[in-house]
């Protein structure tokens, strides 16, 4: 089984169509990876599906970097 970190990064690569090496923990979805608002919504939906969690809109707005996505998923499982 892949780690949460690896699974989140795989989803980001698939959803945003970016290279794996671009998906570093500090990368901003919008500024560094070229995502737009629709991309970020689809990314949150993919995370919800992959990890079987629900991310409220107000929380989703705070998930703006790769690390923020990893942290949210890790904490959602607690």
Curated annotation (Swiss-Prot):
Carrier of the growing fatty acid chain in fatty acid biosynthesis. The lineage of its organism: Bacteria, Pseudomonadati, Pseudomonadota, Gammaproteobacteria, Enterobacterales. The modification O-(pantetheine 4'-phosphoryl)serine is found at residue 37. The gene is acpP. Keywords: Cytoplasm, Fatty acid biosynthesis, Fatty acid metabolism, Lipid biosynthesis, Lipid metabolism, Phosphopantetheine, Phosphoprotein. Its main location: cytoplasm. InterPro entries: ACP, ACP-like_sf, PKS_PP-bd, PP-bd_ACP, Ppantetheine_attach_site. It comes from Proteus mirabilis (strain HI4320). GO terms for cellular component: cytosol; membrane. The keyword Phosphoprotein applies. It is found in: Cytoplasm. It comes from the Bacteria. Residues 2-77 form the Carrier domain. This is Acyl carrier protein. One of its GO terms (molecular function) is acyl carrier activity. Belongs to the acyl carrier protein (ACP) family. It holds the Pfam family PP-binding.
């Amino acid at each position: 089984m892949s780690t949460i970190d690896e699974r989140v990064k795989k989803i980001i690569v698939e959803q945003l169509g970016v290279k794996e090496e671009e998906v570093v923990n500090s990368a901003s979805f919008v500024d560094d990876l070229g995502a737009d608002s629709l991309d970020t919504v689809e990314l949150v939906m993919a995370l919800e599906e992959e990890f079987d969690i629900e991310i409220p809109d107000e929380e989703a707005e705070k998930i703006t970097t790769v690390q923020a996505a990893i942290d949210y998923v890790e904490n959602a499982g607690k």
